[in-house]
Amino acid sequence: MSVSALSPTRLPGSLSGLLQVAALLGLLLLLLKAAQLYLHRQWLLRALQQFPCPPFHWLLGHSREFQNDQELERIQKWVEKFPGACPWWLSGNKARLLVYDPDYLKVILGRSDPKAPRNYKLMTPWIGYGLLLLDGQTWFQHRRMLTPAFHYDILKPYVGLMVDSVQIMLDRWEQLISQDSSLEIFQHVSLMTLDTIMKCAFSYQGSVQLDRNSHSYIQAINDLNNLVFYRARNVFHQSDFLYRLSPEGRLFHRACQLAHEHTDRVIQQRKAQLQQEGELEKVRRKRRLDFLDVLLFAKMENGSSLSDQDLRAEVDTFMFEGHDTTASGVSWIFYALATHPEHQHRCREEIQGLLGDGASITWEHLDQMPYTTMCIKEALRLYPPVPSVTRQLSKPVTFPDGRSLPKGVILFLSIYGLHYNPKVWQNPEVFDPFRFAPDSAYHSHAFLPFSGGARNCIGKQFAMRELKVAVALTLVRFELLPDPTRIPIPIARVVLKSKNGIHLRLRKLH
């Protein structure tokens, strides 16, 4: 009698055979993956061979040199040692070219290469595909659609709203300060810049500085800054599935929820306002619309309105970009002036001479403070709010010095490295506002606090106006002094932050 193929006596042998086949397939896949990684490493070595760099570990790359938030310090050292650009190996088969030469940056920013998708995709659950992350024709359409929201006619009335937000912050400071005590200012400045963007761009009535719910949004943005930065540098967190299972992934998901709840509330409130009698007609009579109204009334080239997903992505993007980068700029400018009292005093004299006894400030005043503007620009050079951007070459490039790169290489455009490049700026660590005197000359791409080229910051003029208003009104009311016991340590995140906060002592004037 024959024995069935499914009988118990045959099962162990069949199972053993299946396991052997599975093990063989697994080994084959591992070998194929290893070969793929090896070939990619060899391609990178050939692609970057014209650019010297420090020795790196075959598996870990330069990662050991960038531990404990030493990225900015390490970049400064490489800028001094390796002219123009330097390969940065994140691991044995993953590298990007660190670029900090103005001629190189002029070439790259003058092209239409996309942002490096792997780097920026980590931000998509947070801000979606808005202007920051879009590429190609869709980016061009959105940019053209939003540009009217930043016309001078729109920006002029915003000065009064900026003044209101800054004065609320300064009133709060008067209540908090005591003799010789210091204040961590970044949180306060973040609320002020969020207040400003809400009033100016989103038609918000009231002040988020007086609303406790806004504090959770600020904390969520701070958490997202840190989480995106650390995830980009953790090889085990590149998988979305594995990241969602980790404690960091769960915190990221919760922070995204908090940020989205805030922006959804803003959109729904404005939509509700537009349903009120007379409000829609009032908006239609405006010569130019503010940011949110541009989005709500927008028509794409095919005649369709923005989808809810696209609308929220643009609001999330501008809510973050419009307040967090400016908060970084204002806070570091205050610190720079606090540590250079002679320049702070001269700025105050200029502002007092302009405003007289009153503290009101107008659009016209903002172009009549040359020395204060010089100090603001020098602080932005030392502390660029966005320390870097990335690009992935869509075609080969040859730089002015003859060195070239093939298609596919990822470039890390270090604004921070550029601003500390001693071949571009003499004594780059010295605070010297006269670098930006009206008669001074410097390379067109030597100073890029708002990036450059077609993808420069769309809100550049808005941000500069806000910086000037904040500095002018603050210096009229307070003397800024450093806290020698808590010197801020700049660290690279999506936005330039301080590892230990920015603490200043404030002395009320008059």
Swiss-Prot record:
Provide the species name: Oryctolagus cuniculus (Rabbit)
Q: What is this protein called?
A: Cytochrome P450 4A4
Q: Where in the cell is it found?
A: Endoplasmic reticulum membrane; Microsome membrane
Q: What induces it?
A: P450 can be induced to high levels in liver and other tissues by various foreign compounds, including drugs, pesticides, and carcinogens.
* EC number of the protein: 1.14.14.1
Leader sequence segment:
none
Query: Per the record's keyword annotation, is rRNA processing included, yes or no?
Result: no
Give the gene name: CYP4A4
- Propeptide stretches are 1-4
Q: Which PANTHER family does the protein's record reference? A: CYTOCHROME P450 4A11-RELATED, CYTOCHROME P450 FAMILY 4
Task: Show the Pfam families listed in the entry.
Answer: p450 (PF00067)
One GO CC annotation: endoplasmic reticulum membrane
Query: Which transformation does this protein catalyse, written as a reaction?
Result: an organic molecule + reduced [NADPH--hemoprotein reductase] + O2 = an alcohol + oxidized [NADPH--hemoprotein reductase] + H2O + H(+)
Q: Which GO terms describe its biological process?
A: arachidonate metabolic process; icosanoid biosynthetic process; kidney development; lauric acid metabolic process; linoleic acid metabolic process
- Known function: Cytochromes P450 are a group of heme-thiolate monooxygenases. In liver microsomes, this enzyme is involved in an NADPH-dependent electron transport pathway. It oxidizes a variety of structurally unrelated compounds, including steroids, fatty acids, and xenobiotics. Catalyzes the omega- and (omega-1)-hydroxylation of fatty acids.
Which GO molecular function annotations are given, in alphabetical order? alkane 1-monooxygenase activity; arachidonate monooxygenase activity; heme binding; iron ion binding; oxidoreductase activity, acting on paired donors, with incorporation or reduction of molecular oxygen, reduced flavin or flavoprotein as one donor, and incorporation of one atom of oxygen
- What does the record say about its membrane topology? Single-pass membrane protein
